[in-house]
Design a protein with these regions (language model features):
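A short helix->beta-strand "capping" segment at the edge of beta-propeller domains
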Residues: 1-17, 47
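Beta-strand-rich domains and repeat architectures in extracellular enzymes and scaffolds
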Residues: 11-38
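Surface loop/turn motifs at the tips and blade-to-blade linkers of beta-strand repeat domains
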Residues: 12-15, 54-56, 95-99, 145-152, ...
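Canonical WD40 repeat/beta-propeller blade segments in eukaryotic WD-repeat proteins
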Residues: 17-25, 59-65, 100-111, 150-164, ...
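Conserved beta-strand element within WD40/beta-propeller blades
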Residues: 31-35, 71-75, 119-124, 171-174, ...
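Loop/turn residues immediately N-terminal
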Residues: 37-39, 69, 78-80, 127-128, ...
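WD40-repeat beta-propellers
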Residues: 40-44, 80-85, 129-135, 180-184
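Asp-box/WD-like beta-propeller blade repeats and closely related beta-sheet repeat scaffolds
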Residues: 87-119, 123-130, 135-149
């Protein structure tokens, strides 16, 4: 007999919220929920009440991240927006129109080689990766474009994972074709190509154990 899951400790409900598409915590006492209607709801986990909500756009919110004082949202369609937190709520600070229509989610990475620097990795165009330093958003993003003629046909970018090895920063990226490219951020070059099953949907990698896992539509 299957073991039933435990009952929730509490349930957060709001008639205006609707279906939730993404979640992230802020300082362990607040939960932000991005909805398919394009809004963000901020919940206080001490009172279980929604402190505020605001509209980002009309597209579903696919990903949310939060630093100490900044919210990052990614919408279906690729728009990535940075929001600053003030006394009156969140204010739009910077928007990147990444022009990406797939399901790959952005990733926030704490740069251990520089204090107080977070790197935002986001999908852009069909198969490129943008890299933005959050402490200097006015500078153009670094764009990793797989335009080497020797590379196989990749299709759409579907997932990626930044990781550090020997004090160097790399990105392992999966594509529709099932190819996985390892990018060296210092040079912006591909240093390894691996062929696996087509249509990877998510991945994780532990550089210490040198082990990774890939999830797809069938397994």
């Amino acid at each position: 007999m299957a073991v039933l899951p435990p009952d929730p400790v509490f349930t957060l409900r709001c008639p205006e919220m609707g279906a939730v598409n993404s979640l992230c915590f802020h300082q362990n006492e607040r939960l932000l929920a991005g909805t398919i209607k394009g809004s963000v709801f901020l919940w206080d986990l001490q009172t279980n009440r929604s402190l505020l909500h605001f509209a980002i756009g009309k597209e579903p919110i696919t990903t949310l991240h939060h630093t100490e004082d900044m919210l990052i949202s990614q919408e279906k369609g690729g728009a990535v927006t940075l929001w600053t937190l003030g006394n009156s709520g969140y204010k739009r600070h910077f928007t990147i129109n990444a022009n990406y229509v797939g399901y790959c989610r952005s990733v926030l990475h704490a740069n251990t080689n520089a204090d107080d620097d977070h790197l935002l990795f986001y999908p852009c165009e069909e198969n490129s990766i943008g890299v933005l330093h959050l402490n200097d958003v006015e500078n153009p993003s670094q764009i990793l474009v797989p335009d080497d003629a020797q590379l196989p046909k990749l299709g759409t970018l579907t997932c990626f994972k930044p990781f550090e090895c020997a004090s160097q920063l790399f990105v392992l990226a999966g594509y529709e074709s099932g190819h996985f490219l390892t990018w060296d951020l210092s040079s912006g070059m591909v240093v390894d190509v691996l062929q696996m099953d087509a249509d990877p949907m998510c991945l994780d990698y532990d550089p210490l154990a040198n082990r990774g896992i890939v999830g797809g539509p069938c397994k």
